């Protein structure tokens, strides 16, 4: 597991000298449940867009941001964090990305595990681990790094791992259901 985390950070933290036209990102900020989480998730997601654009030199048109409330910044947000919009974002990226492209998927917010399935909490119906796997499998020949800063995300390492894909989670186990702060430190690591 440590080697996967190191490889993921190495892949993502090399500061490019030129625009990364074959690099793409999908950042999804989940349903918050209250104002405190809404502000925290917004800060992490909007800061990540800025870091990817300014520090990593990923063109803004290659970055998709879905949030609970797109009106927080209509010029920065691409859509609402719903299952339909998430599926649409994966479809669009799969069609747009070159075969040698790399994709960062950053899930911010709340997740849950009911003893059977992991769910990423969205506005409306949640996305299951099986749905995430189905969407990610469309990027079969491309390098993919999935970072989940959600509680209960440890189960995703079992469900989503495969050759060419790095899965980094905030928790080791699917039973760790407390609020996480991993997203904050993940974003800060790129800023320094």
Which role fits each region the language model picked out?
Residues 4-13:
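Sec-dependent N-terminal signal peptides
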Residues 16-104, 111-113, 118-119, 145:
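Boundary/activation segment at the start of structured domains
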Residues 31-35, 69-73, 109-114, 125-128, ...:
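Solvent-exposed loop/turn segments at secondary-structure junctions
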Residues 40-47, 51, 81, 85-92, ...:
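Extracytoplasmic/secreted proteins, especially bacterial periplasmic and envelope-associated proteins
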Residues 46, 145-192:
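Active-site-proximal C-terminal subdomain of hydrolase catalytic domains
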Residues 126, 136-147, 161:
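Active-site histidine-anchored catalytic micro-motif
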């Amino acid at each position: 597991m440590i080697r996967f985390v190191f490889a993921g950070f190495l892949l993502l933290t090399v500061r490019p000298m030129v625009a990364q036209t074959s690099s793409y990102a999908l950042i999804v900020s989940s349903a918050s449940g209250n104002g405190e989480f809404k502000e925290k998730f917004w800060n992490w997601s909007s800061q990540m867009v800025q870091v990817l654009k300014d520090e990593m030199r990923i063109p803004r048109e290659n970055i998709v941001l879905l949030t609970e409330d797109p009106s927080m910044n209509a010029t920065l947000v691409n859509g609402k964090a719903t299952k339909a919009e998430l599926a649409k974002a994966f479809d669009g990226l799969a069609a747009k990305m070159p075969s040698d492209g790399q994709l960062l998927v950053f899930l911010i917010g709340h997740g849950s595990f009911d003893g059977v399935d992991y769910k990423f909490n969205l506005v409306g119906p949640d996305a299951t681990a099986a749905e995430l796997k189905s969407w990610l499998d469309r990027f079969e020949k491309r390098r993919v790094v999935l970072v989940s800063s959600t509680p209960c995300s440890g189960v995703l390492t079992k469900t989503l791992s495969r050759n060419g894909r790095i899965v980094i989670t905030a928790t080791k186990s699917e039973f760790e259901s407390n609020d996480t702060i991993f997203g904050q430190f993940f974003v800060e690591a790129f800023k320094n």
